[in-house]
Amino acid sequence: MTIAPMANDLEDFESLLEPDFDAKQFGNDLLKATNNNDTTILDLNTPLKKLNYDLHEIDSRIDQLMNSNPLEIIELIYKNEHVNSTIVGELKPSLGYMNMSYDRLKNQVLDPYERARKVQLALSKVYQTSFLLRGALLYIHLSNKLNALSKTAQLSTSTAINLASLHYQLEITLEENKNLKSLRKIKQLDQDIVSPNKRELITFLSLQMCKECLNSIKIKSNKEIISQLAYSLYLLSSQEFESAINKIVLSNVTMSSQILSKILNSIRMFPDAFNEVVEKGYNIYILETLLQNIKTDNVTNSSRSIAANKSRLGNLLSEYTSMKSKAGSGTPRDLFWSKVSSAFKKDFDISVNRGGPVGKSLLKNKDFIINTMKQSMKKSSDNSDYQSYLDVMLNSVSISLNK
């Protein structure tokens, strides 16, 4: 039995059956079609009549369709029911198996995983809280110890060294637990105790280190104290450590330059004067050796990046050199002899260019000056590495003496 004629019974209403049918757009188009653009009165009766007529027409056609094709309609109904029952019957075992598999997956994997995840999250929070409290207790203990030690007596070198160690431990505690800085108690301790004490301690260590390196006697007899002061200052601030070394070197440069400047008028006294300068250069050599013997492999400085901490060279001399490399001055001896040479060259050139008895005396005694430098510079170091600094000093007089 054919059912093809049924497809044409609603052909006048095909637009209403489209998947993208828009009732608002259809109503708007109907209003436009039944109203005149030239009038200001909106006619709603005509489109309503049109819609009522269409509804009546659809009902009429449905009744006519059912009356004229009852068998086809019944056949379609039974066919759809049969298809539905067939699909359900064939898929039901598979769906049941899938549901059973999912239930087993849910019970054996998903639910235990979710419970484990919640437990892990809770444990993580407990661990974080415990770690934070442990760090806070350690920081408070170290702060109280630092406060008590700083109030026991007048600040001395040994006390300052112990305080520097406590400050370093506080720094490590903060490095290991960044969240400590967010605690109000920690902020208060840092503001009231730690930071003020650290500033005072840095100033004290820097001054003491400069005093201990003031002359040859002190620097030779107090090597251990100087090493401890340098290491403690470095623990507190690598920048202040560098600054203190520079002050020591430049202080010796100033005294050496004054000695050499005064001797230009009496060149026969040059050997004694230059020996004094060499002795100061030897003091810087001792300082350099002390720095080289102080290991920093296990030091972590929060003022540097993690990458910088990992790439350390192993001792205070290499740390100082790496900080000075940007300025181009290198080691303390590099700084000392380059500054002394530069100052002496300036004074020497002025005296030679000015002429007169002093200038003539300098030119006349050029070999004497050079030989004195060569002999004396050997005493500026305990090994043969003085040669490069000898060349630096010879360069300070080479141009003038070649005139």
Curated annotation (Swiss-Prot):
GO biological process per UniProt: cytoplasm to vacuole targeting by the Cvt pathway; intra-Golgi vesicle-mediated transport; retrograde transport, vesicle recycling within Golgi
Stored InterPro entries: Cog5, COG5_helical, COG5_N
Topology relative to the membrane: Peripheral membrane protein
Key words of the record: Golgi apparatus, Membrane, Protein transport, Transport
Cellular location(s): Golgi apparatus membrane
Coiled coil: none
Keyword Ubl conjugation recorded: no
Broad class of where this protein is predominantly found: Golgi
Any single GO CC term annotated in Swiss-Prot or TrEMBL for this entry: Golgi transport complex
Alphabetized GO MF terms: identical protein binding
Subunit field text: Component of the conserved oligomeric Golgi (COG or Sec34/Sec35) complex which consists of eight different proteins COG1-COG8.
PANTHER family per record: CONSERVED OLIGOMERIC GOLGI COMPLEX COMPONENT 5, CONSERVED OLIGOMERIC GOLGI COMPLEX SUBUNIT 5
Anything else known: Present with 468 molecules/cell in log phase SD medium.
Protein function: Acts as a component of the peripheral membrane COG complex that is involved in intra-Golgi protein trafficking. COG is located at the cis-Golgi, and regulates tethering of retrograde intra-Golgi vesicles and possibly a number of other membrane trafficking events.
Family: Belongs to the COG5 family.
Entry protein name: Conserved oligomeric Golgi complex subunit 5
